[in-house]
Amino acid sequence: MLNSRFPVSVKKSHSLRERKVFTTILQSKTRFFGTFINAYFIKNNHSTWRVAISIAKTKYKLAVQRNLIKRQIRSIFQQISNNLEPWDILVIVNKGFIELTFKEKQKLFLQLLKRIKEVDAYQTSANK
């Protein structure tokens, strides 16, 4: 029986794995640079959002730390998934992210969501 406190894992349809898509996202001009995360994003042709999380081994040597960060980020994306349009998002985690509280991490990703919505509104108005 599933415990209702813990969300079910992110669906495979919401994860990015193709190298070709990674390079396309990195070459896009839409990005968000923060102290603890950098995010690149691009509109996709799918009906859902997709996310990839990149954590360098040089910044977080222990796999336990890297996995904790990935789980927290996936959980945050799952919480805000109702507000997400179909975007491909590449999140690059910087040093110091693990020291933040979960609420601070949520705040960071809400800022990212706000930035994505601003870019979406700008691109929509520019295409008209």
Swiss-Prot record:
Its EC number is 3.1.26.5. This is Ribonuclease P protein component. RNaseP catalyzes the removal of the 5'-leader sequence from pre-tRNA to produce the mature 5'-terminus. It can also cleave other RNA substrates such as 4.5S RNA. The protein component plays an auxiliary but essential role in vivo by binding to the 5'-leader sequence and broadening the substrate specificity of the ribozyme. The gene is rnpA. GO terms for cellular component: ribonuclease P complex. It is an enzyme of class 3 (hydrolase). Keywords: Endonuclease, Hydrolase, Nuclease, RNA-binding, tRNA processing. It comes from Mycoplasma genitalium (strain ATCC 33530 / DSM 19775 / NCTC 10195 / G37). Consists of a catalytic RNA component (M1 or rnpB) and a protein subunit. NCBIfam families: rnpA. PANTHER family: RIBONUCLEASE P PROTEIN COMPONENT. Coiled coil: none annotated. Pfam families: Ribonuclease_P (PF00825). One of its GO terms (biological process) is tRNA 5'-leader removal. Disulfide bonds: none annotated. Belongs to the RnpA family. The keyword RNA-binding applies. InterPro entries: Ribosomal_Su5_D2-typ_SF (IPR020568), Ribsml_uS5_D2-typ_fold_subgr (IPR014721), RNase_P (IPR000100), RNase_P_CS (IPR020539). It comes from the Bacteria. GO terms for molecular function: 3'-tRNA processing endoribonuclease activity; ribonuclease P activity; tRNA binding. It catalyses: Endonucleolytic cleavage of RNA, removing 5'-extranucleotides from tRNA precursor.
